[in-house]
């Protein structure tokens, strides 16, 4: 097995070289995810597999709507996710499109699944959401997408062990390069 680090936008891939190509948490950050999927699919040998995984934030919600932090968490997420989508920074709802990207890339034997995880405030997983929000906060603030108090409230919720939430769906989609040809 050879594991490689690769920049899908600038580094060439050898056509038909790999039995398996996998990417995770990448495509939602790209302006043209289909082109990236096609590039990766072209690197898979006939009979090999492409597996792509990314988030869909449709499920992001407080697990207990009666928790004192739930309403602010929900309201702020409801403002930020459409803002990030409209700004082109990332596509927070890309996960639901992964199966169609695999099909559009010409792969066969396609499949998909989605898993939502329950996160507890103060956990490492909740910290990941907090840090991601922290990195994106300056842009949200400068464009008026959210106030500092709202961002602070979400940050406090993700650090509060009494608060829990459903995180983004982790969507996986896969397909096989046909043995009689290549992916598109």
PLM region spans:
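A short SAM/SAH-binding and catalytic strip from SAM-dependent methyltransferases
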Residues: 19-34
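Core SAM-dependent methyltransferase catalytic element
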Residues: 105-108, 168-184
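C-terminal helical/coil "lid" or tail adjacent to the Rossmann-like core of SAM-dependent
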Residues: 110-165
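Conserved catalytic/acceptor-binding region of the Class I
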Residues: 51-123
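A short glycine-rich, Lys/Arg-flanked "PGG" loop and its adjoining helix->strand segment in the class I
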Residues: 34-49
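A short acidic, Gly/Pro-enriched loop at the edge of an enzyme's catalytic core
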Residues: 9-21
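Conserved Rossmann-like nucleotide-binding pocket used by diverse enzymes
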Residues: 4, 22, 51
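Conserved SAM-binding strand-loop segment of SAM-dependent methyltransferases
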Residues: 1-10
């Amino acid at each position: 097995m050879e594991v490689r680090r690769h920049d899908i936008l600038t580094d060439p891939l050898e056509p038909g070289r790999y039995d398996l190509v996998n990417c995770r948490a990448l495509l939602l950050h790209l302006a043209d995810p289909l082109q990236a999927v096609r590039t990766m699919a072209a690197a898979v040998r006939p009979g090999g597999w492409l597996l792509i995984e990314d988030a869909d934030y449709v499920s992001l919600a407080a697990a207990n709507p009666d928790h004192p932090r739930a309403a602010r968490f929900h309201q702020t997420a409801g403002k930020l996710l459409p803002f990030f989508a409209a700004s082109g920074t990332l596509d927070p709802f890309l996960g639901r499109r992964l199966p169609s990207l695999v099909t559009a890339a010409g792969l066969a034997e396609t499949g998909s699944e989605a898993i939502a995880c329950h996160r507890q405030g103060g956990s490492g997983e909740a910290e990941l959401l907090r840090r991601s929000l922290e990195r994106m906060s300056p842009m949200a603030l400068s464009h008026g997408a959210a106030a500092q108090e709202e961002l602070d409230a979400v940050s406090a919720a993700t650090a509060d062990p009494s608060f829990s939430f459903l995180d983004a769906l982790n969507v996986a989609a896969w397909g096989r390069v046909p043995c009689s040809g290549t992916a598109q």
